[in-house]
């Protein structure tokens, strides 16, 4: 397996990342365990998940993928062998069951802390190596919407710094 530095960190990640979004919906916990075992045995040390998973997102499977990964960490005692990436969900129609509801989702400090704390609990770990914004909170030119309006009051990055460094 080939490895690369993750950005400017000292973390060496495999060039192949295991995507886990189907664990808990299309794949059972045992399927997930088998896939993670297989990947790790072949040198894949980079796993990607999100609070929103399993896909297709539904209330009944919300956070299920992170729970399966957490169960695997607990059973295999191998958290230190994995570079783990997860993501926070943001405003999106149909996500009323995440935190306080889709209209209140965002990248503010309250939401970010709540999302991280819940992910850590599901993942049965005390750290996430790479934490990402899953979907932009701002309007983006997607699905035929071509206009982008810059919002100079957007403080997402400031919030991320506050959460990370406090």
Region locations from a protein language model:
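Glycine/proline-rich, positively charged
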Residues: 96-166
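Charge-rich, low-complexity amphipathic helices
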Residues: 35, 54, 61-62, 91, ...
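A short linear-motif detector with a strong N-terminal bias
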Residues: 61-65, 93, 109-112
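Intrinsically disordered, low-complexity sequence elements enriched in Ser/Thr/Gly/Pro
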Residues: 2-3, 85, 120, 130
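N-terminal binding-site loop/beta-alpha segment at the start of enzyme catalytic domains
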Residues: 1-83, 126, 155
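N-terminal small/glycine-rich loop or linker at the start of catalytic domains
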Residues: 7-26, 85-103, 132-135, 139-141
